[in-house]
């Protein structure tokens, strides 16, 4: 089976070729893009399908052999530096390949229905193919230079896709915000890469890990400098995976079409940061301060994301903050050294979140004919309610994703999240309790989203007062090519968690996920549990999840929302201590924890003030000097012009006098 490893480079090449074909088609047939829609979708899906088949082949080979294969070619070779290009096939890259290609296929099939009436249909498929190719190339990268190149391509594609509807001012601002915020992390990542090259003299992952460990053991490296370089490396994933304090771009990225929201939040951009931390974890584990920083950043992000999601009215923004929170869980697990558990939650969350985002897109698609095509209404849960009656398949699949994300057994995220909590309680109890409390908040806001959207009475007809071009029959179920991916993603959302179920019989473990996932050296793994031990340790997490769901049912359940108007239902303003608490929570959530306002008043306003200062300096000082020199030349020329009399004898007289004067001056000096 090692023969298939030699063709691993074809996996990112196929979607890259489809993007190239679509780009040539757009340039060659600008007036005929409508007739090329079916062909563009077929090409994109077919080429990514080839990549998916190769990915499954590599995945199966890793299950059987559990060995890494690296293929490297010389790229740039000089006396000072040697750069190589290649790809690595190991359990981490193989499972990420399967994740990216399967979610990517589902998103592309879904896109055919969701974007069917959009003028940028072909362009969107082009961006999707390029985005997928960039992520696949990042996953296969064998060194830091190569991974940085694909890292930047992923950021560029996210900029193009978030700002896909660039005619909307909000979308244009969102893509700029995402791009600029990620520049901060990318700059730190670049400095970290250069720092570790300075320390180890290599960009290769394996070489860096080996040399860095040797240098630490022999005290031949400045530990403080190594810590700074590691934190700079970590700054890249902090921005890309929307970790505090560089998380502010993620909710605004919802301005892009819903299919790209699913791809970004499940398998590409935000997953890239987790993947890079997992790849670099053997380096980070040599530095306990860095590991503690990763864990604290993760749990802080998890709690912050959960609190910000509590009162969101926009369906997609609520799910966006949920992604931010769950990524914090993954960072927490990696910071604790639980390599397998962090990756396990990455996988289970990816399928669950892809299902939820595509389900939200189905809801929005069904709401638009009723409430209008303004996203402020079609995505507002205040105008939803009772949609399960109109869209039963979407409602059932969305409920499956909700149960999984809340950690309700036996759905996928239950197994991974519960192991994260168990490891946190064992290694850093204070972080474990914070993560446990966050699990309760997760169940509350996810069931709040579900109840507001799918249960109770439909409130969308309120929009008729503001929009005359509405459909009085209510929402409708989406087309087959949109519903089919929801059903398909429901399967791994339910069953993939059993790969990590703790089935321990005697001393032989049948924990399938741990059997083949190779753990790099120095990783500290949690001990495996029996069914009884796991069930007992699961009671607190399941209990807090059920409690959060019950509170959401009491406040937002069908009985609470039935026959209540929109303002009364969602307005938290009440008198008394309870009202003050509710108002505080709502303001914290709706105003994004005041973090965006803080950034606007400090960094953004400060940067603009400095820019204005430089503008004034450039306009009045730099340009003033240049312009004044020109004016002096002009005035000088004008003044000497009047001294010209037009006689040659006068000019010769002035020349002779000047020459003798200069000779006399130099003679006196000597």
Curated annotation (Swiss-Prot):
Function in brief: NDH shuttles electrons from NAD(P)H:plastoquinone, via FMN and iron-sulfur (Fe-S) centers, to quinones in the photosynthetic chain and possibly in a chloroplast respiratory chain. The immediate electron acceptor for the enzyme in this species is believed to be plastoquinone. Couples the redox reaction to proton translocation, and thus conserves the redox energy in a proton gradient.
InterPro entries linked: NADH_UbQ_OxRdtase_chlpt_su5_C (IPR002128), NADHpl_OxRdtase_5_subgr (IPR018393), ND/Mrp_TM (IPR001750), NU5C-like (IPR003945), Proton_antipo_N (IPR001516)
Transmembrane segments: 9-29, 40-60, 67-87, 88-108, 124-144, 147-167, 185-205, 219-239, 258-278, 289-309, 327-347, 395-415, 427-447, 486-506, 535-555, 613-633, 649-669
Biological process per Gene Ontology, one example term: ATP synthesis coupled electron transport
Family statement drawn from the similarity comment of this UniProt entry: Belongs to the complex I subunit 5 family.
Protein name stated in the entry: NAD(P)H-quinone oxidoreductase subunit 5, chloroplastic
Main EC class the enzyme belongs to: translocase
GO MF entries: NADH dehydrogenase (ubiquinone) activity; quinone binding
Membrane topology: Multi-pass membrane protein
NCBIfam families: NDH_I_L, PRK06590.1
Compartments in which it is found: Plastid, Chloroplast thylakoid membrane
The keyword RNA-binding belongs to this UniProt entry's keyword annotation: no
Keyword terms, alphabetized: Chloroplast, Membrane, NAD, NADP, Plastid, Plastoquinone, Quinone, Thylakoid, Translocase, Transmembrane, Transmembrane helix, Transport
Coiled-coil features, chain-numbered ranges: none
Enzyme Commission identifier(s): 7.1.1.-
Principal location: plastid
Subunit structure: NDH is composed of at least 16 different subunits, 5 of which are encoded in the nucleus.
Reactions mediated catalytically: a plastoquinone + NADH + (n+1) H(+)(in) = a plastoquinol + NAD(+) + n H(+)(out); a plastoquinone + NADPH + (n+1) H(+)(in) = a plastoquinol + NADP(+) + n H(+)(out)
The keyword Transmembrane helix belongs to this UniProt entry's keyword annotation: yes
Gene Ontology CC terms, in alphabetical order: chloroplast thylakoid membrane
Pfam assignment, any one: Proton_antipo_M
